[in-house]
Curated annotation (Swiss-Prot):
It comes from Cyanidium caldarium. Part of the 50S ribosomal subunit. It is found in: Plastid, Chloroplast. NCBIfam families: rplV_bact. One of its GO terms (biological process) is translation. This is Large ribosomal subunit protein uL22c. GO terms for molecular function: rRNA binding; structural constituent of ribosome. This protein binds specifically to 23S rRNA. The lineage of its organism: Eukaryota, Rhodophyta, Bangiophyceae, Cyanidiales, Cyanidiaceae. PROSITE patterns: RIBOSOMAL_L22. Its main location: plastid. One of its GO terms (cellular component) is chloroplast.
Length: 103
């Protein structure tokens, strides 16, 4: 009963702030918490938790808990911003991989 999403265009530290709050919670409690949470990644994590729930076949709401939520660093995309006198400053676009396991 797991679900993964890869190459999310948000930094892993911002994702971990949200996912650390739902580790160990029951499925229903985590869904309620994520619905009312601020941050643009909360909606994506809610979809991921619902996907992991739909992947489980024989479980009910009462049984399931969020066992682990792994947030791993994805590839970093390098961009450049033009500056004065022909210079350029690097801009790093971070990505994340998220894995949710229910048990």
């Amino acid at each position: 009963m797991k679900a993964t999403i890869r190459f999310i265009k948000i930094s892993p530290t911002k994702v971990r702030r949200i996912t650390n709050q739902i580790k160990g919670l029951k499925y229903a409690d985590a869904c309620i918490l994520l619905k009312f949470m601020k941050g643009r990644i909360a909606k994506t994590i809610l979809k991921l938790v619902n996907s992991a729930f739909s992947n489980s076949r024989y479980s009910t709401f009462a049984d399931l808990r969020i066992q682990t939520v792994l947030v791993e660093k994805g590839p970093i995309f390098n961009r450049f911003q033009p500056r004065a006198k022909g210079r350029a400053y690097p801009i790093k676009k971070y990505t994340s991989h998220i894995k949710v396991v229910l048990s």
